[in-house]
């Protein structure tokens, strides 16, 4: 019995020590890690009569049961914990969440992080929204806003979520915009005007921020359903590729994802082609050598080995939850992306 108590005591000590150590690391750390992930249809198992969620019910086409929901939560948590060298992200944008409750279930999985949820319901017909979760020991909440996107088809689409956070190390204000632009359903060319509309709407909002403060710190993240060299990104937003060693005189938006695209990498496998549709874009004020700074070459597509499909048509791609209506039991049909930032000097 004493041996059992001793073993239990050791396990408890290790649990407390690990949690304390991570907290201490963050307290003395001038960096923060930002991630973005389309988590592929995180629905609960209850019917929402106001949305088209019938496929994701126990009796629906996908036979979405409580066991499958809980398995999905565990898989998502495994990938999120893997990020940032096993410490998890300090802030992460999540796409394709049905409601705030499914995010609450997800963050219960993280015992060594104190995540807070920023979320608003959107008018998307399927009921999927964008959300942001952040560690309250690293960031404080300033404001949450939504940006309505009106597209040419007139079909209600997802809001862009604008979350203003304060980095607690020096009280710097950072604007996070979580995007899930209209899909390519019907074909890339035919659906492009919808994403152009989203880009124009976002750009109008950003211009107001820059008018108020040309040094506004801005991080755009999400699933844009367009690539870095598509018109909506490169022309409307003006988010360009850049040389990490010579950006002090750059103005506007810098696309951290661009080089990955030119290297043939991607976050989403469409047929046999990689698409870099999950992106992180920053204002040039985060690469000017002052205060908060993007750490050069820290952007990456996050591809843990356990998440990579080993066979079939999706070989080397992300292992999804579903392939059509066939249950796979994986993680998501998108790989996450992430990048790291550092506070060069405290105010």
Give the role of each language-model region:
Residues 24-26, 204, 208-218, 226-347:
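Metal-dependent phosphoester-hydrolase catalytic domains
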Residues 44, 101-104, 126-129, 185-188, ...:
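Extracytoplasmic/secreted cell-surface and envelope-processing proteins
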Residues 1-27:
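Bacterial Sec-dependent N-terminal signal peptides
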Residues 50-53, 176-191:
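Active-site His/acidic residue clusters
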Residues 21-112, 122-128, 310-318, 342-347:
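N-terminal, active-site-proximal structural segment of metallo-dependent hydrolase catalytic domains
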Residues 60-67, 88-94, 119-120, 149-151, ...:
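Second-shell loop/turn segments in exported
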Residues 39, 91, 97-182:
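Structured beta-strand-rich core segments of catalytic domains in phosphoester-bond hydrolases
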Residues 34-39, 64, 69-72, 76-103, ...:
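Active-site beta-strand/loop signature of hydrolases that rely on acidic residues for catalysis
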């Amino acid at each position: 019995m004493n041996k059992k108590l001793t073993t239990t005591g050791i396990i408890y000590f290790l649990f407390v020590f690990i949690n304390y150590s991570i907290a201490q690391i963050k307290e003395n750390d001038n960096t923060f890690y930002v991630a973005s992930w389309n988590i592929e249809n995180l629905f609960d198992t209850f019917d929402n009569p106001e949305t088209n969620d019938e496929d994701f019910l126990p009796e629906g086409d996908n036979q979405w049961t409580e066991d499958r929901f809980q398995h999905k939560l565990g898989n998502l948590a495994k990938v999120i914990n893997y990020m940032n060298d096993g410490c998890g992200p300090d802030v992460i944008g999540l796409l394709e969440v049905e409601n705030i409750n499914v995010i609450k279930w997800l963050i219960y999985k993280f015992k060594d992080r104190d995540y807070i949820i920023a979320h608003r319901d959107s008018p998307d017909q399927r009921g999927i929204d964008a959300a942001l979760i952040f560690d309250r020991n690293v960031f404080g909440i300033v404001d949450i806003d939504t940006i309505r996107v009106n597209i040419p088809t007139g079909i209600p689409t997802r809001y862009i979520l604008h979350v203003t956070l304060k980095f607690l190390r020096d009280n710097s204000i950072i604007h996070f915009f979580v995007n899930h632009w209209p899909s390519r359903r019907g074909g890339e060319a035919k659906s492009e005007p919808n994403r152009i509309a989203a880009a124009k709407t976002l750009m109008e909002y950003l211009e107001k921020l820059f008018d108020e403060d040309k040094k506004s710190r801005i991080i755009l993240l999400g699933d844009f359903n367009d690539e870095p060299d598509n018109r909506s990104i490169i022309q409307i937003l003006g988010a360009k590729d850049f040389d990490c060693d010579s950006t002090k005189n750059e103005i506007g938006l810098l696309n951290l994802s661009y080089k990955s695209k030119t290297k043939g990498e991607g976050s989403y496998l469409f047929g046999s082609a990689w698409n870099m549709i999950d992106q992180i874009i920053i204002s040039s004020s985060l690469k000017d050598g002052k205060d908060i700074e993007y750490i050069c070459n820290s952007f990456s597509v996050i591809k843990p080995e356990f998440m990579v499909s080993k066979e079939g048509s999706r070989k080397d791609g992300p292992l999804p939850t579903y392939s059509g209506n066939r249950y796979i039991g994986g993680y998501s049909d998108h790989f996450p992306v992430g990048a790291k930032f550092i506070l060069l000097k405290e105010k």
